[in-house]
């Protein structure tokens, strides 16, 4: 089965690379928002219909790739008074934001609109951050636009401001949204499984989701699974959200609960969350093409976080009036307990099941300032990137069963800047240490760099971005069974999931050129990329680094919201001169995501030693 899957993936990669190469049939001017159908639109339509039929997704409603431009869109209206707010909600089918009054002629569309439960107007009213008479703030407008889109109950939206013809100092706000279908019976053939389930959006006309799925998995040791979740966002206009996820399969059984409020705008004063989970994990699946790693643990975790933000209006920069500076104080409690486990730690330290808890307080200086970009970490979809300087100081008490109580303190700083006509870079540094019996333990310095270039056009059909990522970590005063390590999940060579690189210091760099298509092929957006990953580790006073691993390869990323593919990544990696008994010198990696699962809000918050300005654009500032 796995060999057949690999052959299919490789064939698909070669086919899609061929499709993305500039072809003579694509000589006309290309619109990146439309499918290129070449000289045979009927044949292309047949292919598209076959794809939709094979995917069993022709009854499923999907979001559109609406491009959000951020605060820049509203800059021309800065300082003007809001005169009125007009809101209109559209049915899911037969109309669009651009043509809201088009007659619905198809019987299927009329039937679907008839059984759809429309979103109640108060859902949008609860998201509007300005009131009539307020002054337009472009940053607040951008925050509101992003918040509405992130609710994931609309397939499309558009927010515009219009100056009154008789008073140029006053504007009207127009908000148009188009609902996603409020319910779907969903069939999906995915990379890891085939699933069927029911998906409820706009449940009871409110911003609620309730999803349940049964999956047939493509592996004998995990033949079937069941998962689902419930979510209610912005309860009673409080911006507090509740989330419950549950999962049952041969590897992982359990549930998790989250209730919290994020920093949802530049004017937010407080946030926080409560998180708890309970899981029984029999094995860990690093890559679905590889064998699962046995774990056999039962654990529960809790996290409680509460920050308070104070505005610093006296700090202003003329070049960027949208930025807002904050002084933040916060407190966080983490706890992780294993109720059953085979051992505390493996000999190679690749797996550890150590009980612990911590309480930390922090103060920080943060900047609420971000911009919108497309085609960076995801295809087409709008992403947000921070700008400016953030810093924080943390201190508190940590307890781990192997070492007992220790004090912990850390300094964190980040700086990000968008260089005009060149690109974007973000630097992050953190120094932290434990203290016990007046002696420092497990001191670690972490530094990281992210850079991506501006778009460089190659003709009318292809554009290019260059990515560079680098990490350097240095540790001191480690216990005998503890050290730093690098793998796929913490900045090492992609596809190397084992802790083959361990030591007092580690370094890694990744260089990745990406080539994107400006057109779509039967609904697919795509890019191809190459990469070179180099990682090394060292200990002692001899060679600074005494072990090196290299990885080189090619990959493909595609996106097709109509087929339910939010993100598909196929990567082939080769590791020259790698002589490891437990690791092949090549790997095939597949990542696939869609909007099926409501999502794990807190993820691995319970093992974090820092407090994040959670869910805010300042996502890398530990506060």
Task: Identify the role of each PLM range.
Residues 2, 26-440, 451-623:
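Immediate N-terminus of the mature polypeptide
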């Amino acid at each position: 089965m796995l060999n057949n899957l690999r052959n299919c993936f490789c064939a698909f990669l070669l086919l899609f690379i061929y499709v993305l190469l500039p072809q003579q049939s694509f000589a006309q001017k290309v619109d990146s928002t439309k499918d290129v159908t070449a000289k045979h639109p009927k044949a292309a339509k047949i292919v598209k219909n076959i794809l939709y039929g094979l995917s069993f997704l022709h009854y499923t409603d999907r979001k559109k790739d609406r491009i959000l431009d951020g605060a820049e869109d509203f800059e021309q209206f800065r300082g003007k008074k809001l005169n009125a707010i007009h809101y209109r909600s559209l049915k899911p089918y037969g109309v669009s934001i651009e043509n809201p009054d088009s007659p619905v002629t198809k019987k299927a569309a009329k039937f679907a609109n008839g059984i759809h439960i429309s979103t109640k107007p108060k859902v949008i009213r609860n998201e509007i951050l300005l009131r009539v008479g307020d002054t337009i703030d472009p940053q607040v407008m951008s925050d509101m636009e992003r918040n509405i889109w992130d609710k994931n109950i609309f397939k499309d939206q558009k927010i515009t401001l219009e100056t009154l013809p008789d008073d140029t100092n006053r504007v009207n706000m127009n908000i148009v949204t188009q609902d996603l279908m409020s319910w779907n019976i969903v069939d999906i053939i995915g990379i890891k499984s085939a699933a069927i389930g029911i998906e409820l959006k706009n449940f009871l006309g409110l911003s609620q989701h309730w999803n349940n799925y049964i999956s047939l998995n493509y592996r004998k040791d995990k033949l079937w699974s069941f998962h689902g979740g419930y979510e209610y966002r912005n309860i009673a206009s409080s911006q507090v959200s509740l989330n419950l996820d549950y999962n049952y399969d041969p590897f992982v059984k359990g549930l998790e609960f989250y209730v919290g409020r994020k920093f949802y705008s530049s004017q937010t004063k407080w946030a926080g969350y409560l998180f708890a989970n309970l899981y029984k994990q029999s094995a860990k699946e690093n890559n679905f093409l590889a064998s699962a790693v046995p774990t056999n643990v039962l654990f529960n975790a809790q996290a409680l976080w509460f920050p308070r933000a104070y505005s610093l209006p006296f700090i202003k920069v003329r070049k960027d009036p949208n930025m807002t500076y904050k002084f933040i104080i916060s407190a966080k409690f983490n706890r992780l307990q294993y109720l059953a486990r085979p051992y505390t730690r493996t000999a190679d330290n690749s797996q550890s099941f150590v009980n612990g808890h911590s309480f930390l307080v922090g103060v920080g200086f943060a900047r609420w300032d971000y911009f919108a970009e497309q085609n960076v970490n995801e295809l087409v979809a709008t992403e947000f990137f921070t700008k400016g300087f953030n810093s924080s100081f943390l201190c508190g008490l940590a307890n781990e069963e192997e070492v007992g109580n220790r004090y912990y303190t850390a300094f964190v700083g980040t700086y990000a800047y968008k260089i005009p006509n060149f690109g974007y870079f973000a630097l992050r540094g953190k120094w932290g240490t434990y203290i016990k019996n007046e002696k420092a333990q497990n001191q670690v310095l972490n530094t990281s760099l992210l850079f991506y270039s501006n778009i460089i056009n190659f003709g009318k059909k292809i554009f290019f971005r260059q990515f560079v990522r680098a990490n350097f970590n240095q540790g001191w005063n480690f216990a005998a069974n503890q050290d730093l390590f690098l793998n796929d999940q913490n900045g090492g060579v992609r596809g190397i999931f084992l802790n083959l690189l361990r030591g007092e210091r580690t370094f890694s760099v990744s260089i990745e050129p990406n080539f994107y298509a400006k057109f779509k092929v039967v609904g697919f957006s795509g890019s191809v990329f190459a990469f070179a990953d180099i990682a090394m580790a060292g200990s002692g006073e001899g060679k600074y680094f005494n072990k090196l691993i290299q990885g080189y390869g090619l990959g493909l990323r595609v996106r097709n919201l109509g087929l339910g593919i939010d993100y598909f990544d196929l990567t082939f990696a080769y590791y020259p001169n790698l002589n490891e008994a437990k690791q092949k010198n090549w790997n095939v990696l597949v990542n696939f995501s869609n909007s099926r699962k409501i999502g794990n809000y807190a993820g691995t918050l319970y093992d974090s030693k820092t407090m994040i300005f959670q869910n805010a654009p300042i996502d890398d500032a530990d506060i």
